């Protein structure tokens, strides 16, 4: 995905309702539905409720990343629950100064709770980033694949599809450019999807019989590896491939708890 010179943000989603739900009920449901207690993740993910508010939710916002920009948009729209994929602690331990201090001020001043789900939202069979992207591409009979921290996080599908057609479908699904390194078959045999930054796993992916690999970003050497392995490698951008899960989860919660939701779009260009 082409790099962007600056961050941009915009809002999408319905905001009409004025109903209310208990934060504890939403959190409990998410923890159970996403199986947080069963799924291992990176330490800095700290999945679940990361910051509480006063206890009530009237509007839900979702975003890929926890950021000042996202919190500012929450405040503008009166949202008091922010659901993210990369949470408050993703950068690791930091002193509460500068950016982190500003983020916490925004959250406290505007009564915003923060809930984060990383791998649990990547691998969920209905709401997950991988399942949602596969659905957006029209892929069916998907199977889980690629073990990470004891669970299968990606999806794969056996489908014969011209690789150029898949490239076009991916561009439409992501509403943006795709970097395509076409060294594999002109018609796909098995497509593997792992959203985000999984390009460095290309050798492991190849061992699972994948001839066409879709992910968000990859190191430089992965393009060389794709050539050596005879694979098609399609990079849609880390951010662009991971908008699906937070959108799907927020929409699901909106329907279940009768509160409105919106997606806060803050593309990073990566």
Residue ranges with predicted function:
Residues 4-5, 9-12:
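Low-acidity, Ser/Thr- and Arg-rich intrinsically disordered low-complexity segments
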Residues 11, 15-270:
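Active-site catalytic microenvironments in core metabolic enzymes, especially phosphate/sugar-handling
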């Amino acid at each position: 995905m082409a790099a962007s010179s600056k961050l941009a943000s915009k809002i999408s989603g319905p905001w009409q309702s004025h109903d209310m739900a208990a934060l504890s009920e939403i959190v409990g449901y998410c923890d159970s539905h996403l199986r947080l207690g069963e799924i291992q993740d990176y330490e800095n993910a700290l999945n679940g409720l990361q910051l509480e508010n006063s206890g009530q939710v009237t509007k839900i916002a979702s975003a890929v990343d926890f950021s000042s920009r996202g919190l500012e948009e929450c405040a503008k729209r009166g949202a008091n629950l922010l659901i993210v994929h990369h949470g408050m602690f993703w950068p690791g331990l930091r002193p509460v100064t500068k950016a982190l201090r500003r983020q916490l001020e925004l959250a406290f001043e505007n009564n915003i709770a923060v809930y984060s789900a990383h791998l649990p939202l990547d691998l969920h069979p209905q709401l997950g980033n991988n399942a949602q992207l596969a659905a957006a591409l029209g892929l069916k009979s998907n199977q889980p694949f690629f073990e990470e921290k004891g669970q299968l996080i990606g999806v794969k599908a056996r489908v014969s599809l011209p690789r150029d057609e898949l490239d076009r479908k991916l561009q439409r699904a992501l509403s943006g450019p795709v970097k395509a390194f076409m060294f594999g078959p002109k018609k796909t045999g098995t497509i593997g999807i792992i959203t985000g930054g999984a390009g460095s796993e290309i050798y492991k992916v190849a061992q699972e019989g994948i001839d066409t690999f879709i992910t968000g970003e990859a190191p430089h050497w992965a393009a060389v590896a794709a050539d050596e392995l005879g694979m098609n490698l399609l990079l849609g951008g880390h951010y662009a491939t991971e908008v699906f899960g937070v959108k799907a989860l927020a929409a699901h919660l909106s329907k279940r708890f009768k509160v409105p939701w919106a997606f806060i779009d803050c593309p990073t260009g990566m």
